[in-house]
Amino acid sequence: MNEFFQWVMLHNRPWDTHPPLSDAETEELFELMADPSLDDDAMTIDMADGYMTACAIGPSPVPVHLWLEAIFAQPTLPLPHDPARQQRLLQLLMRRYSDIQAALSVPPADTTVDTLYTPLSSELEEGDCITPHQLNAQGDRIGDWELKYWAEGFRLAVAADDEWAPLLIDPEGAPLLTPVVLYSTGYNPDNPDFQLDAESRTLLPALIGSLYALHDWWRQYRQTHGAHQAHTITPTLVRESPKVGRNDPCP
């Protein structure tokens, strides 16, 4: 049984009535998501943020208990040995998800510095960033770079939901995912001199802009096709490399 479903039912409240997460609360969320007692396959906060962002943008609402199960890689509640930290972690995640929804619902022309969506990203260790880039035998870049795990979380959410298929095959919609793909791969195979590193922020505006454009694409699609339309086409935003666990070395 998915324990997150029961938790959501017991804590069914309007999370958007809370103020946006403060800097201190965001730091607390980072700390809680880094708890070593979480499952090895649980997502990092970066990856979880990307996953939640894709769920908030996507074709139809993803039930909360399902994306929580995906984030923690288990159907049972995290941190069972510490109920207070468990509740705090889940509450902060719910508020972050509400913040994401609120930010992306504002038209780009009306956004301010305070309302603009910004992805969460952990600080990288300089030694983990290998430049110029090197590839492993599977053709994947080795090491870390800016927003790597955020983009991987977004990719996982898209790959898990067949309803993304209309966008993936649309000649105008699919290119909107280009910044996400670039952040996921860390370099451009067609332009090897361009690569992401720990300090580069040059593509961040393009990434954020693409998220608003994706949100608008799906809004228009729902208006034209309805909110709930089944799709059977297999999504193509999938890499063959396995998911990296929170305690696994970087590929």
Named regions from a protein language model:
Residues 1-151, 155-251:
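Domain-length accessory/inserted modules outside core catalytic folds
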